[in-house]
Amino acid sequence: MNFKYIIAVSFLIASAYARSEEYDIQSLSQRDVLEEESLRKIRGIGSAILSAGKSIIKGLAKGLAEHFGKRTAEDHEVMKRLEAAMRDLDSLDYPEEASERETRGFNQEEKEKRIIGPVLGLVGKALGGLLG
């Protein structure tokens, strides 16, 4: 008789343990589902914040490019003069024919006087415009 009770009690204990394991598995799966939902919400919020940040940065970059990218007619003229002066400076470096070398000293001094003064002024204006 005691043997029957021992078997019955152990059967009840085993079935109770099996039910508790089943409930634990269900609660874990429910917890996993809830965690997954909360992670999806967090990811959604994060992606929304990230896209808003990207939009803000793109807007700022576009605004800065428009603001600093605009050249007035005066700036354009200054740049044209600067380019012409640079071409003149480059022409000083080219070798000349022997017949032209006699007048080279005079011509070079004239070119340097004509170029260096305006170039310094243009560079000063350009730097002042960029920094100002």
From Swiss-Prot:
<feature type="modified residue" description="Leucine amide">
    <location>
        <position position="131"/>
    </location>
</feature>
<dbReference type="GO" id="GO:0042742">
    <property type="term" value="P:defense response to bacterium"/>
</dbReference>
<keyword id="KW-0044">Antibiotic</keyword>
<feature type="propeptide">
    <location>
        <begin position="72"/>
        <end position="112"/>
    </location>
</feature>
<feature type="propeptide">
    <location>
        <begin position="19"/>
        <end position="42"/>
    </location>
</feature>
<dbReference type="GO" id="GO:0005576">
    <property type="term" value="C:extracellular region"/>
</dbReference>
<keyword id="KW-0964">Secreted</keyword>
<feature type="modified residue" description="Phenylalanine amide">
    <location>
        <position position="68"/>
    </location>
</feature>
<keyword id="KW-0878">Amphibian defense peptide</keyword>
<keyword id="KW-0027">Amidation</keyword>
<keyword id="KW-0732">Signal</keyword>
<dbReference type="InterPro" id="IPR007962">
    <property type="entry name" value="Bombinin"/>
</dbReference>
<dbReference type="Pfam" id="PF05298">
    <property type="entry name" value="Bombinin"/>
</dbReference>
<dbReference type="GO" id="GO:0050832">
    <property type="term" value="P:defense response to fungus"/>
</dbReference>
<feature type="signal peptide">
    <location>
        <begin position="1"/>
        <end position="18"/>
    </location>
</feature>
<dbReference type="GO" id="GO:0051715">
    <property type="term" value="P:cytolysis in another organism"/>
</dbReference>
<keyword id="KW-0204">Cytolysis</keyword>
<comment type="similarity">
    <text>Belongs to the bombinin family.</text>
</comment>
<keyword id="KW-0295">Fungicide</keyword>
<keyword id="KW-0165">Cleavage on pair of basic residues</keyword>
<keyword id="KW-0354">Hemolysis</keyword>
<keyword id="KW-0929">Antimicrobial</keyword>
<protein>
    <recommendedName>
        <fullName>Bombinin-like peptides</fullName>
    </recommendedName>
</protein>
